[in-house]
């Protein structure tokens, strides 16, 4: 991968990561970007003049596993390099979950017909309150949770990648056309929402993407929808605070300055639970650079 030989290795609990910078042109995103998220991040990054956190990349395939929007914003800012944490994606300790869309509605029946209109072209199924099956479908399959008089889970069992992408984008387009508030939550948070039976909350998500489906994007060039995967690593790196000006320099100069910055910093382990950017992290450790 690339010509950069300078790498800062860290071993956390027998899970090895390598910290370095790589050429942006050598990396492969596996997801599309959300323009709203990118616009907000772009403004903040330009104002600060630095990238806070490195992205995470599979060292075998050069596929970006975490940090698609940071990658996209550095491209927009004409940077040549990006700070990365290299990992071995074959490790069983790296897990893949999915992000789920949480939609706030005054009256879910207003978009119910639109949702069924989208699904009628496919061999969908419906579940009503069969808890164990319900949770399995939320985690594994493409689904929509409708909290109507009789709550319903509409789902498509193991759709192919193209069908999955079409449906996720179609559902998102309904939400955006109605100008409804939407946020992203985890699988565990989604199950808690279903248990609450809040009649003003709709949930939907695509199928859970597998590791081979993530890597295959490099060959197929068809990206998964934005926020499709939620990767969970044993450890993540925070606050490298890399100046953007370094990432625009010629290769040798950029690499040397980047590693000079790392050598001057101290790193410390944050054991879960810990707080980062107003989020309580419970699933992995953090390495904080100061």
Where are these regions (language model features)?
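Short alpha-helix boundary/capping and kink motifs at helix termini
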Residues: 2-63, 69, 75, 79-80, ...
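Short, charged/polar micro-motifs that form catalytic or ligand-binding hotspots
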Residues: 59-64, 200-204
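Short active-site-adjacent helix-start/loop capping segments
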Residues: 64-66, 74, 92-96
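Helix N-cap/beta->alpha junction signal
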Residues: 66-67, 207
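Alpha-helix N-cap/helix-start and coil->helix boundary motif
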Residues: 70-71, 211
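Solvent-exposed functional surfaces
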Residues: 86-290
């Amino acid at each position: 991968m690339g010509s950069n030989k300078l790498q800062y290795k860290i071993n956390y609990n027998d899970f090895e990561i390598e910290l370095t910078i790589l050429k942006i042109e050598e990396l492969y995103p596996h997801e599309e970007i959300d323009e709203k998220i990118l616009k907000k991040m772009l403004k903040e990054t330009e104002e600060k003049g630095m990238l806070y956190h490195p992205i995470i990349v599979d060292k075998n395939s050069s596929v970006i596993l975490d940090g698609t929007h940071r990658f996209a914003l550095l491209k927009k800012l004409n940077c040549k390099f990006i700070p990365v944490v290299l990992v071995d994606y074959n490790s069983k300790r790296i897990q893949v979950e999915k992000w789920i869309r949480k939609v706030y509605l005054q009256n879910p029946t207003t978009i119910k017909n639109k949702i069924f209109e989208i699904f009628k072209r496919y061999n969908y199924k419906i579940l009503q309150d069969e808890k164990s099956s319900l949770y399995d479908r939320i985690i594994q399959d493409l689904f929509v949770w409708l909290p109507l008089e009789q709550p319903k889970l509409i789902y498509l069992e193991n759709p192919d990648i193209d069908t999955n992408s079409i449906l996720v984008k179609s559902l998102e387009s309904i939400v955006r056309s109605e100008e409804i508030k939407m946020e992203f939550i985890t699988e565990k948070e989604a199950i808690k929402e279903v248990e609450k039976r809040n009649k003003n909350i709709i949930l939907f998500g695509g199928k859970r993407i597998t590791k081979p489906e993530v890597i295959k994007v490099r060959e197929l060039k068809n990206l998964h929808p934005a926020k499709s995967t939620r990767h969970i690593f044993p450890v993540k790196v925070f606050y490298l605070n890399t100046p953007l000006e370094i990432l625009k320099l010629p290769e040798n100069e950029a690499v040397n300055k980047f590693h000079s910055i790392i050598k001057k910093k101290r790193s410390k382990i944050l054991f879960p639970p810990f707080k980062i950017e107003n989020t309580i992290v419970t699933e992995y450790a953090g390495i904080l650079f100061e």
